[in-house]
Protein backbone atom coordinates (compact mmCIF):
# COMPACT_ATOMS: atom_id res chain seq x y z
CA UNK A 1 0.00 0.00 0.00
CA UNK A 2 2.90 2.35 0.76
CA UNK A 3 4.08 2.30 -2.87
CA UNK A 4 0.56 2.97 -4.10
CA UNK A 5 0.40 5.96 -1.75
CA UNK A 6 3.68 7.41 -3.02
CA UNK A 7 2.74 6.84 -6.66
CA UNK A 8 -0.64 8.52 -6.15
CA UNK A 9 0.58 11.50 -4.08
CA UNK A 10 3.56 12.51 -6.28
CA UNK A 11 1.51 13.96 -9.17
CA UNK A 12 -0.66 15.80 -6.62
CA UNK A 13 2.50 17.43 -5.22
CA UNK A 14 3.89 18.18 -8.70
CA UNK A 15 0.54 19.69 -9.74
CA UNK A 16 0.54 21.79 -6.53
CA UNK A 17 -2.80 20.31 -5.44
CA UNK A 18 -0.98 19.37 -2.24
CA UNK A 19 -0.06 22.83 -1.02
CA UNK A 20 -2.64 24.96 -2.84
CA UNK A 21 -5.70 22.92 -1.81
CA UNK A 22 -4.73 20.06 0.49
CA UNK A 23 -2.20 19.31 3.16
CA UNK A 24 0.09 16.33 2.61
CA UNK A 25 -1.82 13.08 3.15
CA UNK A 26 -1.35 9.36 2.61
CA UNK A 27 -3.85 7.94 0.11
CA UNK A 28 -5.58 4.93 1.69
CA UNK A 29 -8.59 4.45 -0.58
CA UNK A 30 -8.77 3.91 -4.33
CA UNK A 31 -11.15 6.27 -6.13
CA UNK A 32 -11.95 6.08 -9.86
CA UNK A 33 -13.41 9.16 -11.54
CA UNK A 34 -14.60 8.83 -15.13
CA UNK A 35 -16.53 10.89 -17.65
CA UNK A 36 -18.29 8.71 -20.24
CA UNK A 37 -15.93 5.82 -19.45
CA UNK A 38 -12.85 8.09 -19.86
CA UNK A 39 -10.87 7.81 -16.63
CA UNK A 40 -9.53 10.96 -14.97
CA UNK A 41 -5.76 10.76 -14.43
CA UNK A 42 -3.70 13.29 -12.47
CA UNK A 43 -2.61 16.20 -14.64
CA UNK A 44 -4.19 14.96 -17.87
CA UNK A 45 -6.16 17.44 -19.95
CA UNK A 46 -9.87 16.99 -20.64
CA UNK A 47 -11.99 19.25 -22.83
CA UNK A 48 -14.79 21.11 -21.00
CA UNK A 49 -17.24 19.68 -23.57
CA UNK A 50 -16.30 16.15 -22.46
CA UNK A 51 -16.96 16.87 -18.76
CA UNK A 52 -20.35 18.56 -19.09
CA UNK A 53 -22.26 15.69 -17.49
CA UNK A 54 -21.72 14.45 -13.95
CA UNK A 55 -18.80 12.00 -13.68
CA UNK A 56 -19.02 8.49 -12.28
CA UNK A 57 -17.04 8.34 -9.03
CA UNK A 58 -16.37 4.84 -7.70
CA UNK A 59 -14.95 4.13 -4.26
CA UNK A 60 -12.88 0.97 -3.93
CA UNK A 61 -12.46 0.90 -0.18
CA UNK A 62 -14.24 0.62 3.11
CA UNK A 63 -17.46 -1.36 3.28
CA UNK A 64 -21.17 -0.56 3.23
CA UNK A 65 -20.96 0.58 6.86
CA UNK A 66 -18.31 3.22 6.09
CA UNK A 67 -19.21 6.56 4.53
CA UNK A 68 -17.33 9.04 2.38
CA UNK A 69 -17.65 12.69 1.34
CA UNK A 70 -16.63 13.83 -2.15
CA UNK A 71 -15.71 17.45 -2.91
CA UNK A 72 -14.87 18.82 -6.39
CA UNK A 73 -13.23 22.24 -6.65
CA UNK A 74 -11.32 24.53 -9.03
CA UNK A 75 -8.45 26.36 -7.26
CA UNK A 76 -7.62 28.48 -10.34
CA UNK A 77 -10.55 30.94 -10.51
CA UNK A 78 -10.75 33.20 -12.41
CA UNK A 79 -7.26 32.35 -13.74
CA UNK A 80 -4.20 30.46 -12.49
CA UNK A 81 -1.95 33.55 -12.39
CA UNK A 82 -4.30 35.43 -10.03
CA UNK A 83 -6.80 32.99 -8.48
CA UNK A 84 -8.40 35.55 -6.17
CA UNK A 85 -11.77 33.74 -6.12
CA UNK A 86 -10.28 30.36 -5.18
CA UNK A 87 -11.50 27.80 -4.48
CA UNK A 88 -14.57 27.53 -6.69
CA UNK A 89 -16.86 24.75 -5.52
CA UNK A 90 -18.24 22.42 -8.21
CA UNK A 91 -19.81 19.54 -6.30
CA UNK A 92 -20.30 17.96 -2.85
CA UNK A 93 -21.71 14.47 -2.25
CA UNK A 94 -21.86 13.08 1.31
CA UNK A 95 -22.69 9.74 2.94
CA UNK A 96 -21.39 7.66 0.01
CA UNK A 97 -21.20 4.05 1.27
CA UNK A 98 -17.82 2.35 0.79
CA UNK A 99 -17.49 0.00 -2.22
CA UNK A 100 -20.21 1.94 -4.11
CA UNK A 101 -20.27 5.11 -6.20
CA UNK A 102 -21.39 8.72 -5.74
CA UNK A 103 -24.94 8.00 -6.96
CA UNK A 104 -25.51 6.18 -3.64
CA UNK A 105 -24.60 9.28 -1.63
CA UNK A 106 -26.48 12.50 -0.89
CA UNK A 107 -25.73 15.39 -3.25
CA UNK A 108 -25.64 18.48 -1.02
CA UNK A 109 -24.19 20.84 -3.66
CA UNK A 110 -25.25 20.07 -7.23
CA UNK A 111 -22.68 19.39 -9.98
CA UNK A 112 -21.55 22.47 -11.87
CA UNK A 113 -19.75 21.82 -15.12
CA UNK A 114 -16.21 23.19 -15.49
CA UNK A 115 -16.05 26.48 -17.41
CA UNK A 116 -12.42 27.64 -17.34
CA UNK A 117 -12.19 31.17 -18.72
CA UNK A 118 -8.52 32.19 -18.44
CA UNK A 119 -5.61 29.77 -18.75
CA UNK A 120 -5.36 26.14 -17.68
CA UNK A 121 -7.42 25.23 -14.61
CA UNK A 122 -7.06 22.26 -12.27
CA UNK A 123 -10.27 20.47 -11.32
CA UNK A 124 -9.75 18.50 -8.15
CA UNK A 125 -11.79 15.63 -6.70
CA UNK A 126 -11.12 15.06 -3.00
CA UNK A 127 -12.44 12.09 -1.03
CA UNK A 128 -12.76 12.09 2.77
CA UNK A 129 -13.73 9.16 4.97
CA UNK A 130 -16.45 10.21 7.42
CA UNK A 131 -16.27 9.04 11.03
CA UNK A 132 -19.96 8.11 10.75
CA UNK A 133 -23.02 8.72 8.60
CA UNK A 134 -24.10 12.31 9.24
CA UNK A 135 -26.06 15.24 7.93
CA UNK A 136 -23.81 17.78 6.26
CA UNK A 137 -25.49 21.02 5.26
CA UNK A 138 -22.68 23.32 4.26
CA UNK A 139 -23.59 26.99 4.54
CA UNK A 140 -22.35 28.12 1.14
CA UNK A 141 -23.44 31.66 0.23
CA UNK A 142 -21.37 31.48 -2.96
CA UNK A 143 -19.43 28.77 -4.79
CA UNK A 144 -16.43 31.12 -4.85
CA UNK A 145 -14.01 31.34 -1.90
CA UNK A 146 -14.78 27.78 -0.78
CA UNK A 147 -12.03 26.30 1.40
CA UNK A 148 -11.60 22.52 1.32
CA UNK A 149 -9.37 22.49 4.42
CA UNK A 150 -11.89 24.54 6.48
CA UNK A 151 -14.75 22.37 5.25
CA UNK A 152 -12.88 19.23 6.39
CA UNK A 153 -12.24 20.77 9.83
CA UNK A 154 -15.82 22.00 10.21
CA UNK A 155 -17.24 18.52 9.56
CA UNK A 156 -14.45 16.61 11.35
CA UNK A 157 -13.41 14.78 8.18
CA UNK A 158 -9.67 14.67 8.86
CA UNK A 159 -7.19 14.41 6.01
CA UNK A 160 -8.32 13.15 2.59
CA UNK A 161 -8.10 9.44 1.77
CA UNK A 162 -7.91 10.01 -2.01
CA UNK A 163 -7.65 12.82 -4.56
CA UNK A 164 -7.30 13.16 -8.31
CA UNK A 165 -7.26 16.16 -10.66
CA UNK A 166 -7.49 16.96 -14.34
CA UNK A 167 -6.61 20.09 -16.30
CA UNK A 168 -8.93 21.95 -18.64
CA UNK A 169 -8.89 25.21 -20.55
CA UNK A 170 -11.44 27.12 -22.56
CA UNK A 171 -12.22 25.48 -25.87
CA UNK A 172 -11.92 27.61 -28.96
CA UNK A 173 -13.91 26.73 -32.07
CA UNK A 174 -10.68 25.42 -33.62
CA UNK A 175 -9.98 23.10 -30.66
CA UNK A 176 -13.51 21.65 -30.73
CA UNK A 177 -13.09 20.31 -34.27
Curated annotation (Swiss-Prot):
Tissue-level expression: Expressed below the apical dome of inflorescence and coflorescence meristems, and in inflorescence stem.
Leader peptide range in chain numbering: none
SUPFAM superfamilies: PEBP-like
Effect of residue 123 to V: Early-flowering and terminal inflorescence
UniProt keyword list: Cytoplasm, Developmental protein, Differentiation, Flowering
Pfam family of the protein (one): PBP
Gene Ontology, cellular component aspect: cytoplasm; nucleus; plasma membrane; vacuole; vesicle
Miscellaneous section: Mutagenesis of His-88 to Tyr converts the repressor of flowering 'TERMINAL FLOWER 1' into a 'FLOWERING LOCUS T'-like activator of flowering.
Entry's family note: Belongs to the phosphatidylethanolamine-binding protein family.
Function (record text): Controls inflorescence meristem identity and is required for maintenance of an indeterminate inflorescence. Prevents the expression of 'APETALA1' and 'LEAFY'. Also plays a role in the regulation of the time of flowering in the long-day flowering pathway. May form complexes with phosphorylated ligands by interfering with kinases and their effectors.
UniProt-recorded name of the protein: Protein TERMINAL FLOWER 1
Source organism: Arabidopsis thaliana (Mouse-ear cress)
Gene that encodes the chain: TFL1
Amino acid sequence: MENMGTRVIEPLIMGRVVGDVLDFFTPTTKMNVSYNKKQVSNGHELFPSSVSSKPRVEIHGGDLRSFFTLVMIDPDVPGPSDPFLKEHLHWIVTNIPGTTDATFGKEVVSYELPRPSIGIHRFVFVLFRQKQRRVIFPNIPSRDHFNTRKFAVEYDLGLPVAAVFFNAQRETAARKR
